[in-house]
């Protein structure tokens, strides 16, 4: 059985690696052509176009790896079936359950690889991509209104709420165009801070540069009090908004790991803000690696098709169609779940569960009737 396992694993891994390399080459070419349009801008060179396309590769690999696993495994299984090698293995004692177990173990390895890439490699490279593009464009603007964060605190003076607005980030990751508004429990405006830029420390303290600090009177007779205004070169603003929360608000979702997505969704819930989108993204990121296991089981069914049922090219084409349908279903269900307010984990698990049922049904039917 060790010989059978070694032969199957070597054949499947080499096929998956070839398909993944083909996908990455195609995606690199597309991204590189897209980056070439920027040549001619001040400071933008050909090597920058290559670097920009290279930074996109880990994210593309993460998204395409389950499809590469499906197509590569289908190709390997169909080739073994066409050459009657799989029939010989079945005659030698390779039962359907044992074959499913062997490929399930390999699928778990691919799932672990997908999880590691998505959790550790992709967030880092996506952040570098954002900073790289920000350096070329002079900073990254966060839409027309910027990114908004909320914070609530309870002190000796009562409950305070803060609304923080960040206009963008520069190439060094520094926050640009910061506005902080303070309100009391009754919604009265107490203070405002406008800073040119700032950074968030490890202790969640914001260090603001060129800050304009304005406070409004809190007395019973505001007409007798005066508004105070200070201009400070540096201002330290204590906060509970950590660097991770701020990064999640100002950077794209692709730059966040599953842990960061969960923490930010919890922060949004604590602040009574909409967290459905980030919870769905968290569950999709947590469950997406399992697609490799599901699609590996689906590919095993092609080994039980008779060689005369179609050539390898036809089976590979079927695998490509199945992979495209999985990606489309995964995206469509995510958008529908967000619009309809479905349970986040159910939205993320629905495509993989559906394909798992499909693969088991097809596998059982082929084993019994073919």
Task: Mark where each language-model region is.
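Short helix-to-coil transition segments within interhelical loops
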Residues: 90-95, 340
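Non-transmembrane, extracytosolic/lumenal segments of membrane-associated proteins
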Residues: 47, 107-222
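Transmembrane alpha-helical segments that form the functional core of multipass membrane systems
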Residues: 273-364
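Extended, hydrophilic extramembrane loops/domains of integral membrane proteins
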Residues: 243-272
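Long, hydrophobic alpha-helical segments
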Residues: 22, 57-77
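Transmembrane helix boundary and interhelical loop/hinge segments in multi-pass membrane proteins
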Residues: 73-86, 92
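Hydrophobic alpha-helical transmembrane segments
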Residues: 1-59, 181
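A juxtamembrane structural motif centered on a specific transmembrane helix
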Residues: 244-248, 356-370
